[in-house]
Amino acid sequence: MILNGILDPRLFPQYSGKSHVVEWRQELKRALLIRRKFKSDWSGESVELDCEMHEGIITRGMLRGVMWQWMIFHEYNCFLLKHSEHQPNPPSKEWCIQRSFELYGEENVRNWWYSLPFKSIPFRL
């Protein structure tokens, strides 16, 4: 299990690429549960028995068919939520950006965002 360092799939060659997304998401979720003390990012309630991981700043749907989609599964973009907080309406992109800024620092999150290989950046942070 990966517990040290930044949880960025680009830093772990064994998880790089689309073919390893499922394994990487499982590792990322396990590590985030420990780091965030099994608490929901939205409510602070326990997610020990009821946890979903939400990509909040940029989603899979926004990058459908893009070869580098796997790069969005980064700790800065993933949020732990109870099922009832995730469905039917997950937290807004704006809330996720603010939460990530609080957890990791605005400069770090911006550096990650602008390092993604967009043809054109969909929005500014």
Labelled PLM ranges:
Residues 42-80, 89, 93-95:
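Histidine-centered nuclease catalytic patch
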Residues 1-37, 44-50, 95-125:
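A boundary/linker detector
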